[in-house]
Structure formats: C-alpha cells, structure tokens
C-alpha cells in the first residue's frame, strides 16, 4: 500500500494522535478541502467561547478595573508561545502589534546596537513586507542593503538559505542579517542555528521571521542561539485574521537594544508618568502600547491547543503531510505539467509545498469555484498547498489533490476567468 491508495491514507488518519483536534475547529462545509492553513488557519471552537467570555465576564462587568489584570497580558501570552511552539524560556517574547511593526522595531534596534557597521543583508525571496521595510530603513540611516538574488520560482531549491549561500556576503561591516525561517513561496527552510552562529561569529546580529514556521515545525530559539525573531499567529497558529503578532528578544541582549518607538508600556515606572523615557529592563522594554486583549484571547486559546497537542507531534504530521503531497504530485500532477518548487528533504521545508504551473492563477480560482478546494496563488506561477496539522486530515489532502488532478486533466479550469480580487 502507498499514499496513492485512499484507504491507506484513511488508515493514517485512524492512527493519527492529532486527529481528535480536527473536531475542535469550525467546519462550515464538510465537503471543502481547505489546504490554505499556511495563510489563515481555521477557527477553533474554543476561541468563540474565549472571546464571548471576555466580553461578557470581563469587559462587561469589570470595566476599567479589568486593567489591573489585563495590563501585562502581552508577556504571559508570549511565554505561552515560547513554551508551546518556539522553544524559548519565559521573559523573552511579547504578543503585540503586527509583524511589520515588530520587524521595524527590532531591525532599527539591531542596527543602532552596531553603530560602526553599515551593511544589512537579506534575500530577494524574502516576504515583501520585510524587504520593503528594509529598503526604507536603509534610506533612513544611509545603510548598504545587500539583496541575495535567490528568487527564481523555476528552481526547486534556489530559495533555501544556507551558510554556503550567505558566506560570500559576510564581513566586519555587517550589522544585521535577516531571513525567513520558512520561505513564504517555496516553503524552503533556512539553517537557523548554523546561520545564527555564522553571523554572530563576525559580530553581527540576526533577525529571523518565523511567520510561516510557527505552529508547523519544531523551533528551538534559545538553543539555536537566536538573537531576535518575529512572527504572526494567524497561519498555523489559528488565532484569526489580524490577530496580534509577537517578537522575541534573547535575554542576552535585551538591555543592549533600544527600539525607536518608545511607548509608555516600555517605561520602567509606567504609571508615574515621568518627564523622560527610562526603558524597562525586561522584555516589557520592547512593548509600545496596550495589549490587544480580544486578539490575545484568540492567541491564548489557539496556542493552548498547540501546547496540548505537542509541537513535536505537530512537526511530524507536517513532515508526513507534505511527503504525501509530494508523492501525489510525482504521480498525478507532474504528468499534467506541474513542477515542484519545494525541497524534497523534509528537514529542508515547512508545512506547505509550492506547485508551479503556467496557468497557476486560473487553476487556483477554478479550484475554489468548481472543485471545493482552497489553496492560494503566489505570483508569478505558484499554487501553495498546506497541511495545518491540527485542523487538516490526511484524507483531506488526498481528496484535494485528486480534485486538482481531475480539474487540470479535464481542462475545465480554462473556462474560469482569473479573479479580479486584490487578494490571491
């Protein structure tokens, strides 16, 4: 038996230690194959309860008195992420703001901590918001931004960042190096510990973006020697659209760094309302303003579920689920003109794979409108499909790929117009 046999895949679900969690998510249409948890996770039922309880049992009756226990919620919620998904000890993570804001804050703090260095390194396959922010920072501070050219969606492993890729660009002028842990398009996984060690050896700092990694693979920020990290919570974290992001600052360097936006939540004696800013000597020194409490309740309920499931089991299912996808691609989709833009080694990828096809945009729209399959499209020619380990069954993946094969083999997708939506 093999992955090509649906009964074999059903048996995988029967033996799956995470299968029980699927019933904890809202599934409006049981016939839908939702393979886009890498973009937005499903809604956990317990989140509905958590938000309702906050509105009716806290905000409603407590009013402003609630701030006595709400005020510091960004920190223990950050500790929950560290324990459940990031391999980080307490006191190093805040759940706050957006990934873009946190990225800007930590980038500027890092370059200010290396004032005699003028070079920042990233890669052209990095997520656009990170690249755009770096361009602005480089202009603002007169820095040399080096962009490693690795964005070729037709080369399967070209986007993966390794020490060998980075080495030619390193010298004693490098202040900051920043990459994705999992590349947003291809799903390629960077060498986190090795690259961090490599950059620290020349005196630079490394900022990782874990947005496409958290909740899909096992991370160990502390033992990997990571300096700085940011990420979102709404993908494999299942915390909802627009949910608060997070930032990680190693205790080693917290007192060394100063963020550019000095909000009052970072003030040492916050409620003395003093005339000058004095940074709190803890992770709170990186918090700008009030925690987003409704969003934080969503994060808490979702990451408590991840903690219950165990990130090791989650990572195993990600690896097996993407292995299933790749085998189905080899037998069903490659003969139909698809290419694979994701590393085959499970240690070199995350929870999604990228299927390249010249008609990718049209196929993606047709899958949603004709086949009840939801993946997503990324320019110029990629369809991303993912297994979200707590919410997705193996057979949902199998059925989704069977529908992709049927749609493309029949040519029916050619009758569908490409979407006019700004969102793909």
Give the predicted meaning of each segment.
Residues 1-424:
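Pyridoxal 5′-phosphate
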